[in-house]
Amino acid sequence: SRNYVRQKKKVARCHEKIRSQRRDYLHKLSRRITDQYDIVAVEDIDMKAMGQCLHFGKSVQDNGYGMFRNMLDYKLTWKGKKLVKIDRFFPSSKKCSKCGKIKKELGLSERVYRCTCGNEMDRDRNAAINIREEARRMLAV
């Protein structure tokens, strides 16, 4: 029917607008990062596998991480800078950024990383420090 076609076009326009806004935001963010830093380290995450995970599903595909990483890669390369990819099996979240001890279990619901050495911080900040240090180690070799 005519109404169905009209509504389908409206939905398509909404999706196009969202796609355009996401792309614009990611371009601006990647530009700001490449202007500010000479070396950027990222975790080499398997986005396809995360998208198929029951816990994350479509939200992982909607965030545009793969597109963002590609933008960072080509912009850094274009400026003669470096993107360091940390292996996806590196225990960035489970490793203590102070003492180096690796936790055996760390659930996604645990938002604060607590170690027996007394280190206590946001788990994402702990992972970011570990990724930075692993990138430094990789570049030194």
Q: What do the PLM-derived regions correspond to, one by one?
A:
Residues 1-141:
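Positively charged, helix-rich recognition surfaces that bind polyanionic ligands
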